[in-house]
Amino acid sequence: MESIIKEIEMMMELPLHERQKAYFQDLLNAAKPVTIVPAADVLEDYELDYIRHVIKPKPKECYRNSHLLCEAFPERILYCEGKTNVPIPIDHAFNKVGDAYIDITFEFALHENPSIYEYVTFGEYDAKTI
């Protein structure tokens, strides 16, 4: 779970403008490695059905997918922005349920096991904030 953070640290070693250095330092300070679990481990059956039949997650729409899930269940699901390695780091959105993290884009839209990838969150937001 360190390659995304190492990438940020390597960027800070480059000859950057002060604003760029400040950006990467803020990113590094906010970075929190997380582990993704299967949605079925933390969601109820009706929530899983809602994802499949109402949200209908789509590939390349992680921000939309995660946002809609947070809005559907605002009392228990947070929206997260960060990065994942697949195998290169990409900006990505996923969700937090209690103390667990899920990725409905990888799991439902791409039919992949997201737990095999490295994830880092830079921010976790409730429905009112996003």
Where are these regions (language model features)?
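A structural boundary/capping signal
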Residues: M1-I130
